[in-house]
Amino acid sequence: MTTTTTTDDTQKLDPSASDEVIYKSWDLLIYEIWVLGIVSTWAWGCSTTEYLLPQFRANVGTNHLDVGSGTGYYLRKGGIPASTRLTLLDLERPALDLGLQRCGRSDARGLQADILQPLPVIDKFDSVSMYYLLHCIPASVEDKCAIFKHIKHNMTPDGVIHGANVLGKGVRNDGHFAAYVRRGVLKAGIFHNLDDNAYDFEHALRMNFEEVETRVVGSVFIFRASRPKLDEGDLLET
């Protein structure tokens, strides 16, 4: 997979949004209603408002990193204090611009980078979120699990990482609607999660964090992990 990493960590929303960004805004508005509303509840069996949004709201710190912000739904609905420093990360610039546009914070910072690689900044975040991101990454489950190994180096000693993703393996049998949706997103190349499973993700979290909480709701793996297992060099930098 070819990826691009930009080390400029002070990107703000370009006021002259391109046609591509405008098109994607409509695309992602549909996503917000369809995926976070209908599909999450009725296909994956995990209500966004009942399970995911409450976890997000309970785990936002004073220096927060949101990875793969999409429509900015969680950032708008998450009750983030005005005093919280907010950074958005995405691989694609149009998606990053859209997140900055819709997050409700004019002072939010944008970071264009590949989450599969170590972050090109030295910031230490006390909270990191990634909701409905991992199942969209075209990578092996091993590479996805490695995200937790390198992102912990950008977290404070008491930092928290939390999120959720749709599993492709070791979950309940899909109903007719879920099977229809799953076939569609796999065929379209939106999902890359055939081997994504709760065991591997939980193992990776426990290898890199002292405290780990996970559960599977329907077909969705929900996680919260805190107190990253940092080495001496990381502790000296904090």
Swiss-Prot record:
Record has Phosphoprotein as a keyword: no
Membrane spanning residue stretches: none
GO function terms (MF aspect): S-adenosylmethionine-dependent methyltransferase activity
InterPro entries on file: Methyltransf_11, MeTrfase_VrtF, SAM-dependent_MTases_sf
Cross-referenced SUPFAM superfamilies: S-adenosyl-L-methionine-dependent methyltransferases
The keyword Ligase belongs to this UniProt entry's keyword annotation: no
GO terms, biological process: methylation; terpenoid biosynthetic process; viridicatumtoxin biosynthetic process
Broadest EC class assigned to this enzyme: transferase
Record family assignment: Belongs to the methyltransferase superfamily.
Organism, scientific name: Penicillium aethiopicum
Enzyme Commission designation: 2.1.1.-
Described function: N-methyltransferase; part of the gene cluster that mediates the biosynthesis of viridicatumtoxin, a tetracycline-like fungal meroterpenoid with a unique, fused spirobicyclic ring system. The first step of the pathway is the production of the malonamoyl-CoA starter unit for the polyketide synthase vrtA. The aldolase vrtJ may be involved in the synthesis of the malonamate substrate for malonamoyl-CoA synthetase vrtB. The polyketide synthase vrtA then may utilize the malonamoyl-CoA starter unit, followed by sequential condensation of eight malonyl-CoA units to form the polyketide backbone.
One Pfam family of this chain: Methyltransf_11
Pathway connected to this protein: Secondary metabolite biosynthesis; terpenoid biosynthesis
UniProt KW keywords: Methyltransferase, Transferase
Uses in industry and biotechnology: Viridicatumtoxin and its derivative, viridicatumtoxin B, exhibit anti-methicillin-resistant Staphylococcus aureus (anti-MRSA) activity. Moreover, viridicatumtoxin and a C2 acetyl analog, spirohexaline, have been demonstrated to inhibit bacterial undecaprenyl diphosphate synthase, a potential new target for antibiotic development.
Protein name: N-methyltransferase vrtF
